[in-house]
Amino acid sequence: MSGEPQIRYAKTADGFSIAYYAMGSGPAVVDLGPPPASHLRMELQIPEIRTWYERFAAQRTFVRLDGRGTGLSEREIAEYSVESLVLDLEAVVEALELDHFTLIGQVNSGLAAIAYAARHAEQVDALILWCAYTRGSEFFDDSGTLFLRDALSRDWGMFTESAANSRFGWSHGDHAHRFAELWREAVTPDVQALLMDGLHGADVSGLLASVEAPTLVLQREKRGIDVARRIAASIRSAHLVIFDGTSAAPYLPDAEQIWCEIARFIGLESEPEAVVRNSRGEASRGLLTILFTDIVGHTEMMQRLGDAKGRDVLREHERITRATLKQHGGAEVKTMGDGFMASFGSVTAAMECAIALQRAFAAHTASM
């Protein structure tokens, strides 16, 4: 994407001016973002976020909006609710004259995404929910969130820094600090409090059965698996995928895995311009099959075995994986500490490699 997308404004049914942009071409993907930390201009200055959005814009018309009270939208509000964000979305959809589109709801905005999809089944082709919940109490009664709510009334800077680190994980401190700066510019403490108090009593669980769109439920293992399972079980065409870790951002730390799930779900190429070399050094271009490996319970394993023995297990995992990839013509794209991302020229080769890996690890475990 060259340059910055043009910011436009839409008027809601209750009179608020909502900032939005659309970039790219093709069928639309509307991302509600992670309110209230939403600022259309500032988020594009954060490389990880910009790269994530540009992936959509490379193959679709990608739409983002700042909900009322946040970012570049009208900032003076008296209340915040699921209904208000639905009205904001309706205004942008009408302004862009979108007949149908893919809708993405992240964390807090998942409530509005579910409500909109239930009410406008004819417009939502697909629904993607990232770390979403259906009852405000499932999120705001968490001990960590209660601590942050208390911090909000005492120190705005401490609140945003702590909330950002909680959101992304303490291992991504630099990114969390940049996002905390965005957070402070995107919203005032008063509006932050309005959102937390206004959404605490929200409940869209009764609308799940009315969602007709195929739905992809993406959830972090340590951010409420039971909630995600309940959502997936209540939507008739839902598919649940669980990822390791705690980060509430889809672009950190395992963006490739998450992107491949989204791309597969809505019919995008995972890497439209990818050129890779297999183990024989032969270049290939076009559609690729991506294989991911992962050590389940890696953190718990390291705690149980200790650093020295844990590293021995990781080294053996790497040795077996690389040898098996070579045998099956796979190309190592990158390693992620406790897992690999590899590409293959066909689904068959990837499946055969996956089966071989399972057998190799089973044989190694049996010999220990």
Regions found by a protein language model. Name each.
Residues 276-360:
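Catalytic NTP-binding/metal-coordinating core of nucleotidyl cyclase/transferase enzymes
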Residues 274-276, 361-368:
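Active-site phosphate-binding and catalytic loops of NTP-dependent enzymes
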Residues 200, 299, 362-365:
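A structural signal for long alpha-helical coiled-coils and helix-turn connectors
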Residues 104, 130, 328-329, 367-368:
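Short, flexible active-site-proximal loops enriched in glycine and acidic residues
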Residues 2-271:
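Ligand-binding pocket scaffold of soluble enzyme catalytic domains
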Residues 47, 80, 308, 312, ...:
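Residues at secondary-structure transition points
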